[in-house]
From Swiss-Prot:
It comes from Vesicomyosocius okutanii subsp. Calyptogena okutanii (strain HA). This is 3-phosphoshikimate 1-carboxyvinyltransferase. Phosphoenolpyruvate binds at residues 22, 94, 122, 168, 345, 388. Its EC number is 2.5.1.19. The keyword Amino-acid biosynthesis applies.
Amino acid sequence: MSKFIINPSNSMYGNLKIPGDKSISHRSIMLGSLANGVTKISGFLEGKDVLSTLKGFQNMGVKIERNSDNVIIYGVGLNGLKKSLVPLNFGNSGTSIRLISGILAAQTFDSELYGDESLSKRPMGRVINPLVQMGALIESNDGKLPIKIKGGQTLKGINYDLPVASAQVKSCILLAGLYAQGETCIKESILTRDHTERMLKGLGYRLDTNKNKICLTGGAQLNAANIQVPSDISSAAFFIVAASIAPQADITLIGVNVNPTRTGIIDILKLMGANLSLSNECVIGGELLANIRIQSAQLKGIRIPKDLVPLAIDEFPAIFIAASCAKGETILTNAKELRVKESDRIQVMADGLSILGIENEVFEDGIKIKGGVFSKPSSTIKSHHDHRISMSFAIASLRCHYAIEIEDVDNVQTSFPNFVELANQIGMNISLVSA
């Protein structure tokens, strides 16, 4: 196990290129494997979560070559996967296991899927239930991992109203729909990230989208293409918040994914008074990219709008740090989903903020944070093996006059392997220490 020791710093300057988007990297491996022909990927994220997806498809017979952040996939088509000789281990990656379940539900062979201790606590019923409605046969551990998927089932298209705002559930059903007889339609009451839909279209698959409804008909094919993965806004979020709260800061993040279904972090921080701007906007591979410049600002507390919650669901740990440095109170509700991430992010962040002297009140579906001044930490902060918790409390050092220690930070490797390197490059002072 490793820990962060972060010494105080109060300024950030420079330009950064953030690693590739995790969501898009996952999907590029999955859909590239199912496409006909050779898919070339650049900007691929080399984090542990995405490598779990890559390894899973290699175990199912797909030839994949990797050279740093460049990947070549020799697609096998929708029906070319082979039974893995070993159970498929997806480590800590909820995206991998939920999306791949939709693909495996339609295969001719049986599959067994499992993950690490953290992933084994997360709910799988939200994808199992619609897949069973489509005709899948799935055994689970009371709605959790491990799961066994029976091969040889004929799937049928369904009309499905998403009970929770989840791009993972939506994507799982769409991927199963590629194999299903007839039309599969999904209706979402609140907009969620749409990378799966964009990539399916980019690989030549027809989707019909009408406001909050997405439909596709099974039986068509995916055609290989070159995919450029933009920088991940969820990883960029730590530096966006860091520069916003630092006493002195002026940084620019290059080529960040600003897909409108992912920019809740930007919208929320602007409501709080952040000084940030976008430039050099362009569309590459169906995704919107831009440079983001962030300068120091005096933030104010807000009530976070309900419609922005799913558009910033992965960024809330960092937003909680921003709220801690804001003038007044910030209130978040309608975010119960945060309790079933890699950790209970509402409670774990609340506990850490209390260690730093920040008043907060926890709700079942959110939190109220009273902005203040970080005090001398009363103890070491526990990350609960959650990468976003570790990185969020690391950036708190920009407003803390004392060293902060964070336990169990190994999982930062799942999404942002060079976080410490980039943070120190622009003025932070983080040491990674083996415990």
